[in-house]
Amino acid sequence: MTLTDLPASLSSCRRCADAGYFIGSTPISTLNAGAVFMTVGQAPGRHEAEVTHLPFSGPAGRRLFRWLAQAGFDEATFRATQAMVAITRCYPGPHPAGRGDRVPSRAEQALCAPWLAAELTLIRPRVLIPIGGLAIGKFLGNDTTMTDLIGERFERDGHLIVPLPHPSGASQWFNVPENKVRLGRALEILAELQRLIGPRDAQS
């Protein structure tokens, strides 16, 4: 499969539907062949599914891009040149408790995993930005808390990894003042990487 073929294949995916899982949207992601940075979220939200069909374009997305602006990224340029994907690609529906979105099950994550694997192989982003606990666990494991990971830089399988907390307004993580300092350090790392790495043709 090539990167040109991948969006059409992804849009026709029926793996979760055929397995009996709720599907609240068509698959949502943004792919660019020259992407140096790739954000990886949990799953599209309701706003993305029903209104924009763009990753991180609801209230959480606005907060995310305010953070990225502090690191020197322009939203329009980022969307046009970088990659934005998720652990699962379709809106999973509301949380049973009535607040926020349902967390995709492990089975759904496994069904969607080949898409992320293909994108990592085809795009080869230098920097991964996993956003929120589910995505962070995918790349850095679940043995360490977000408190110990946010504000640090890691290298795995040829990728630099800079985790960010989920920008949801429902997150309690930001109630701890020290966590805001950790977020600031993470954004400083991203700003430095943008200055050092630059566009794809500047990479070794």
Describe the function of each predicted region.
Residues 1-198:
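A polyanion-binding, active-site-adjacent surface
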